[in-house]
């Protein structure tokens, strides 16, 4: 019944596309008038559009004409004219939706339409890609169109200076990677002035490969962190013990990806820990004094039995590097959290880095929800349409192809064992190679790609291997995978974003000839050669894509298939499976094994059965649902932190922007004074119950007030009188500092103290939340909802953090005993910059800042200690010396140079 209705009325997607096609006629009707414009007149359209917007027009009012202008500019500058289906893609993106467009349909060119239109507002547009290569490539190629029309273009890649980034972000259109955008957002919110920040307020983002960024990478938050205590020796000791365990000591569940010690395992590991002197005799692993070791043992177990080298990570140049399970790429700068990375380093016998403490973090889910408008493009997102709608409120619209898809998708072939499967794959590769048909073989891991490469080497079949180990050549290798007789092995979607053209990619080959004297002649030669090769490849049947396993996600399988048959080219795809494959073994083996027994499968024989295909699809749906739940759960927890993060970041920005810090100081002083007085002189209490001694101590600790006991003994004095007196005394202390150093200088110093104190308590709060998060799931055993418990406790911790902020801030301000008479305003600004430089530029990679996680507020205040007049220095009081040059005589009077005396330490 449903299928009949679909045929009659079409799907919701069909109806949306039909509506959009009616708008395309309006754009096309403007083409003749736009086409006859001179270059100068065409460029001037940008000025006209901006003027219209200034006078109250909306983007939708100028949409059709703007799209027609971009189409004509692209035709003149790049020789590429937007097809009607590309205009549809542009409309979808402008309206804040996701355009699903097949591989080779020109998504990069599509983005120019909404990017140009939305950049006319002057608020900036971010075009987001998955790696630096694509960001550089797209900004260079599409930037010609924007520049022709008078718009500026920027490109953000790793390693740029803040000044260069600031210029790029202030461009009308900025191409950047998702990682750099996220890290720059976090870094900006660790800076000390608005001038040092690089990002503008969020406006509009167009995400290329949107499924990869918003779904595949959503489970991994981006983190700026700093090292904490060095526990590398303990990781090494635990690793040696874990190696001695056998299979009966633990049980693992591959479906749930969990591993736990058995009772026997606990007994064995306790005896080994006692033997090595790690725990005391007669104590157990789960005794209170040893509970911290459970974490190390669990992570070492996971490292050895749940993570596989060249599948989940690789070892390069003495470092453990994470492999993205979806793309096969190395995730530069990423480290597993909670000690897992250290456990892997111990397992692989490489240098163990310190554990990290989070200084700032955010998930891509919450980062991209900051944008006023968000849209994206991908070749495959319909399978995740509900998730994109639920989490990001993004609708997915499938755009028709410009040319009909002629690719043939063959049925899966299922074999009894991995060896039989490889034999069948080898036979097909040999057949294709002999007739010259290019082949792309997709694997799910580096390990599998190297295994297959080894088989082809033995058979003397020339081929290229594309995986995380060779990512530098990624774009070039994948671009030439469509050449005559080419055999390419690629992990998953490595090289995604680069088209595979039949006969080869002329632009990539020409790029290598830039420095050749015979550049022009060779360019023509290459184009002719590729045109000839393309015809030969078409005659062989086009690109043949072979999948060696089904991925957990149907979308990844579809992406692999989509490599073949671009823009109406011929091609074939086929998956080869075996009962040894992870997906089959873990999720579908029982059901499929029963079918195979019924059919009586013989050695080396393949089967094609609808029930097996259905079973595989159900298994994939099950895994997809599980992964979706994980991402949704991560978001639920991160939303708690995100609410707090927004408050802190907004507060921090207000502090930086404010010209007067006295308001916050004044209100906080009054609040703390009232709180302290009422603590030791409770309302309604008798005078003899007042704790004046401790009140005196506390007032000196917080405000540096020397409180006179006799003031309390006056007749008729009340708690309110004492509170007012304390507030006045605190104000007098501040006023005396202001008179000594100038109000402007004190205002800058107070702002600096407030910012550094806020950073300190926020960092400590994140540490507390990390610990709370790690153990919160155990509340489920007490019939409590972990999320509700996390929300409640996180709120309590946040309140506690705000109280700590106020106390630490006030205490630091009122205990200023530094001689600031010679301190200039620009000196504080300079010290801000130095501190920020140390925070951001000393990191090893974007996710691992060496910003000292252990610094106290006193450490942060060191930069304020600058020049002091030598005659004001007291020999027996180093605090009065201020900054001393290393080659000056030491102020203590020893006669030695400062660097050899008190400065030696």
From Swiss-Prot:
SUPFAM superfamilies cross-referenced by the UniProt entry: Helical scaffold and wing domains of SecA, P-loop containing nucleoside triphosphate hydrolases, Pre-protein crosslinking domain of SecA
Recorded topology in the membrane: Peripheral membrane protein
Domain of life where this protein originates: Bacteria
Pfam families per UniProt: P-loop_SecA, SEC-C, SecA_DEAD, SecA_PP_bind, SecA_SW
Gene3D superfamilies in UniProt: Helical scaffold and wing domains of SecA (1.10.3060.10), P-loop containing nucleotide triphosphate hydrolases (3.40.50.300), SecA, preprotein cross-linking domain (3.90.1440.10)
Cofactor note: May bind 1 zinc ion per subunit.
Family annotation (PROSITE patterns): SECA, SECA_MOTOR_DEAD
CC per GO annotation: cell envelope Sec protein transport complex; cytosol; plasma membrane
Catalyzed reactions per annotation: ATP + H2O + cellular proteinSide 1 = ADP + phosphate + cellular proteinSide 2
NCBIfam families: PRK12904.1 (NF009538), secA (TIGR00963)
Entry function: Part of the Sec protein translocase complex. Interacts with the SecYEG preprotein conducting channel. Has a central role in coupling the hydrolysis of ATP to the transfer of proteins into and across the cell membrane, serving both as a receptor for the preprotein-SecB complex and as an ATP-driven molecular motor driving the stepwise translocation of polypeptide chains across the membrane.
Protein name: Protein translocase subunit SecA
Gene field: secA
